[in-house]
Amino acid sequence: MAGKLKPLNVEAPEATEEAEGQAKSLKTEDLLAMVIKLQKEGSLEPQIEDLISRINDLQQAKKKSSEELRETHSLWEALHRELDSLNGEKVHLEEVLGKKQEALRILQMHCQEKESEAQRLDVRGQLEDLMGQHKDLWEFHMLEQRLAREIRALERSKEQLLSERRLVRAKLREVERRLHSPPEVEGAMAVNDGLKAELEIFGEQVRSAPEVGAGEGEAGPELPRARDEEDPEPPVAAPDAL
């Protein structure tokens, strides 16, 4: 019970007994006054039966009042016991209510902590996903840069090889021209022998140039082979044919 129980408005047995005693005294005084009056009038005898009847009525009324008083006293005690019991039950219910409210508060705090932890885990998972995506993009960018550097290096090597190849071909054409030209001075045979030796060296350089290009092509991605249309490679004559 939430409110305080109000005390019952029941009169105490002592007050009831006092009221009953006063009524009894008044009735006794009335009887004495009646007896004295009858004695003076000389008519006491005819009124004895009436007096006895009234006394019996008073005794019955007294007995009934005593029984009502005992019942009232018993009811008063029972109501007070019930009031004490209800007060005790009220205290017990207030204690239970306090415990339930404390348990509810703890449960709400626990739920809030769980929700906060779930939000932190969600944010952490999203952050890890973003970091993973950023790492993949960074690795792809680094790979792209490395491949671009390798491609530029291969292109420079290709240009260098083409330049060397054109230079060697020019030297070969010069040597062949000199070999096929008629001798004009003495000692032309010695010059031809030197030119043949130089031609052999240039031929070896020409044959080794494609091998170097093929070796570098294995290290990096395959590039389209450029065709030197301006300076086609002439057939190299064998030294013995000269």
From Swiss-Prot:
InterPro entries named in the record: SYCE1
Domain of life: Eukaryota
GO biological process terms, semicolon-separated: synaptonemal complex assembly
Coiled coil recorded as keyword: yes
Chain segments annotated as coiled-coil in the UniProt record: 44-181
Keywords for this protein: Coiled coil, Meiosis
UniProt region (Disordered), positions on chain: 1-24, 206-242
Example of a GO cellular component annotation carried by this entry: synaptonemal complex
Similarity comment: Belongs to the SYCE family.
Function comment: May be involved in meiosis.
Name listed for the protein in its UniProt record: Synaptonemal complex central element protein 1-like
Organism listed in the record: Homo sapiens (Human)
The organism's taxonomic lineage, starting at the top: Eukaryota, Metazoa, Chordata, Craniata, Vertebrata
